């Protein structure tokens, strides 16, 4: 890994490998709440943060944290409509990726549900 000289707060001290960044990308999708948000947006196209809070039945702060992660990683994008922030999936391939993962899971759900290695890594 190489050292980056910039002092920007958005610059890493070292450059992660492509594999590390890809794993982080999938961890962004690896949260049940974030997947629920993406499913809701995929079904309806655009939703306000308030509507997502209502549909998910979670505290506003929790939903906002997950939306922030999804936005930062490029999974969703926003626009303002008066006082509301409206969210939508940033790229149709995100929805396709989630749909593909669900289709693959259909063939292997029992094994994935019983996987202790993934649970141990996230603890």
Mark where each language-model region is.
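Amphipathic alpha-helical dimerization/coiled-coil segments
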Residues: 1-21, 43, 91-123
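N-terminal helix-turn-helix DNA-binding core of bacterial DNA-binding proteins
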Residues: 13-61, 81-94
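Alpha-helical residues within the helix-turn-helix
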Residues: 54, 71-72
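Residues within the DNA-recognition helix of helix-turn-helix
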Residues: 66
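A short, surface-exposed loop/turn module that caps and links secondary-structure elements
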Residues: 61-63, 119
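A generic local structural motif
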Residues: 22, 72-73
